[in-house]
């Protein structure tokens, strides 16, 4: 098989893995269409709020795992840093724009964390810690998600990850921030819903 076919197949696989709407499927098992409740976002946070903590944790774990698997397969199949970084980014895009849900997906936070864990484990854990600190200090999951995403990119630079990785992580953070643009508007207006608040 020509090398470019391998690259194309791996990227297509990364997109399709990212596209698997685990949050939607987990919520459906609980009898809920997550697209029609809460924020309407197909992500673990909305599953947690709309279905329950256990369902939210399962959705997060599966979204995280599919990102990690997409990157791991690229690392094992092609190797290097550039191509797996691209696969990580494609997996995030797959989650945000899944073919199975007419390209209306989630915001990419859990999938992004999973996708960059094999490439930059320390930076990813630092980003996740940043999310936890900000989210629990402010009770804004959206703010924690945005800060955590950008901190992953910053820490990847600071920890000396191979050059494509920090740039890909930063690109993913920009995409995640864009998907949170309505949350950002509400944060600025003081109307964003806090964690644990009633709908």
Question: What do these predicted ranges mean?
Answer:
Residues 162-172, 183, 194:
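C-terminal binding/interaction regions
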Residues 69-109:
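Helix-adjacent hinge/juxtasegments
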Residues 9, 13, 72-73, 133-137, ...:
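Residue-level signal for alpha-helical transmembrane segments in multi-pass membrane proteins
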Residues 4-12, 56-57, 61, 84-89, ...:
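Hydrophobic alpha-helical transmembrane segments
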Residues 48-51, 74-77, 90, 94, ...:
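Interfacial segments of multi-pass membrane proteins
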Residues 1-12, 65, 69-86, 117-123, ...:
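Helix-coil boundary and interhelical linker segments in multi-pass alpha-helical membrane proteins
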Residues 13, 17-68, 96-110, 136-147, ...:
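Interhelical loop and helix-boundary elements at the membrane-water interface
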